[in-house]
């Protein structure tokens, strides 16, 4: 969304072998004025209008958007039963990635000793169920990815656990230890791999989410957003 994500995302998708990638041209150019969406946040439905129009034209399986500094990832997926594109919350997309990582590492015998799944206290409790299913320690931290990074540093210093995945509900996750903040290009890599995994089974990401609800239970979530602008808004905050 008029930011820094396009170049790394295009590069990693190309390196992974994804060829049918379409870019919404009017939002591809970095521009701090954000001419097509004054509030360039993947959580904001208005930011998706142009991308969804392109997705319908191309009959795309999934639609991805990163925020201007490329730390958060939003996603829509086509529901083949209705033909409509449905949105995923940050909790939903992170659970798809986290469950995939744990299931694949478990199946391949690459899950490290004392593995840990870290998430913020405002994130979905589905993470607890997923971690428990694979014998992974689940750790909750305060809101803010720096606290997840703090756990990573603790693990490295003490050896008490090995970080496997971390996430927060505000559309951010980190599937590795190379950074201490959420990373949208890495999330793109993982979510596209998950989508390809389900597609190989004749399923969509949405089908995969339904499978997870059936396996781990349905976790209802909701969020209220309040915008307070300018000096008056700052005073109210």
Locations of the language-model features?
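Gly/Ser/Thr-rich loops at beta-strand to alpha-helix junctions
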Residues: 1-7, 70-72, 122-125, 230-232
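Short helix/loop capping segments that flank catalytic or ligand/cofactor-binding pockets
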Residues: 5-9, 22, 32-33, 73-75, ...
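Short Gly/Thr/Asp-enriched flexible loops that form oxyanion-binding sites at enzyme active sites
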Residues: 9, 71-91, 127
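N-terminal small/polar loop signature for handling phosphorylated ligands or for N-terminal nucleophile
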Residues: 11-75
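Gly/Ser/Thr-rich active-site loops/lids in small-molecule metabolic enzymes
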Residues: 19-23, 83-102, 186-190
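Short, acidic/turn-prone active-site loops that include or flank metal/cofactor-
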Residues: 25-29, 90-94, 142-146
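Well-ordered alpha-helical segments embedded in enzymatic catalytic cores
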Residues: 46-50, 97, 147
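Phosphate-binding and adjacent anionic-ligand microenvironments
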Residues: 56, 60-62, 84-86, 104-237
């Amino acid at each position: 969304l008029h930011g820094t994500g396009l170049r790394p995302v295009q590069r990693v998708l190309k390196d992974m072998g994804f060829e049918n990638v379409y870019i919404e041209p009017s939002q591809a150019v970095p521009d701090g004025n954000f001419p097509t969406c004054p509030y360039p946040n993947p959580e904001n439905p208005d930011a998706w209008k142009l991308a969804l129009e392109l997705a319908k034209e191309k009959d795309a399986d999934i639609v991805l958007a990163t925020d201007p500094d490329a730390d958060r990832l939003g996603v829509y997926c086509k529901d083949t039963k209705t033909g409509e594109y449905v949105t995923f919350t940050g909790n939903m997309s992170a659970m798809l990635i986290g469950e995939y990582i744990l299931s694949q590492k478990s199946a391949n015998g690459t899950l490290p000793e004392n593995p840990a799944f870290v998430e913020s206290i405002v994130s979905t409790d589905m993470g607890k169920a997923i971690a428990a299913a694979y014998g992974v320690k689940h750790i909750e931290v305060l809101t803010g990815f720096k606290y997840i990074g703090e756990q990573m540093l603790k693990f490295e210093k003490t050896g008490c656990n090995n970080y496997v995945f971390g996430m927060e509900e505000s559309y951010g996750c980190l599937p590795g230890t190379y950074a201490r903040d959420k990373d949208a290009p890495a999330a793109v890599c993982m979510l596209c791999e998950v989508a390809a995994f389900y597609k190989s089974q004749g399923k969509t990401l949405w089908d995969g989410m339904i499978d997870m609800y059936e396996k781990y239970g349905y976790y209802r979530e909701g969020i209220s957003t309040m915008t307070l602008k300018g000096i008056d808004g700052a005073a109210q905050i």
